[in-house]
Amino acid sequence: MSIRVIYPGTFDPITNGHLDLLSRACALFDHVILAIAESPNKKTLFSLNERVDLAKGATAHLNNIEVTSFHGLLIHFAQQKNIPILLRGIRSLSDFEQEWQLCHMNHRIMPELETLFLMPSEKWAFISSSLVKEIAQYRGDVSAFVPDCVKEALLR
């Protein structure tokens, strides 16, 4: 039996923390879908297509990953893909509180949906896309936090 999971998020932009979680997920599961949310209620730096392209570039070294985008509710995307497992990363207690609510709301709507949580490696536990964007906005060096393709995009 092939175990497939969806790792959803905005990924604006994808960071080394995301890549750490993805590489570990690829070792645990047969197929990982990196599902990039349109997120119309969020003000994103990169367009949906740019975020997909950056994620594809950053994950090219991973064999069992598929990068795609989705619109609307994540549970509808999971149903469409026939994948009942979500993978989420938790860096902090505040992440846990938000993920706990989402997990239970999703489960209430789609009872067969399970959410698995992975803690980041200690090296990447403090990184967030928001912090990376703020550092880049003031022309700080983000090379330790993002893959090269993202660094180049942030410098444009």
UniProtKB/Swiss-Prot annotation:
Q: Where does substrate bind?
A: T10, K42, L74, R88
**Where is the chain membrane-spanning?**
none
One MF term in the entry's GO annotations:
pantetheine-phosphate adenylyltransferase activity
Say if the entry is tagged with keyword Nucleotide-binding. Answer: yes
Q: Which cofactors must be present for this protein to function?
A: Mg(2+)
Instruction: Enumerate the residues marked as the site Transition state stabilizer.
Output: H18
Known catalysed reaction(s)?
A: (R)-4'-phosphopantetheine + ATP + H(+) = 3'-dephospho-CoA + diphosphate
What's the chief localization of this chain? cytoplasm
Biological pathway: Cofactor biosynthesis; coenzyme A biosynthesis; CoA from (R)-pantothenate: step 4/5
Q: Where in the cell is it found?
A: Cytoplasm
What is known about its subunit structure?
A: Homohexamer.
Q: Which family does it belong to?
A: Belongs to the bacterial CoaD family.
What is the name attached to this protein's record? Phosphopantetheine adenylyltransferase
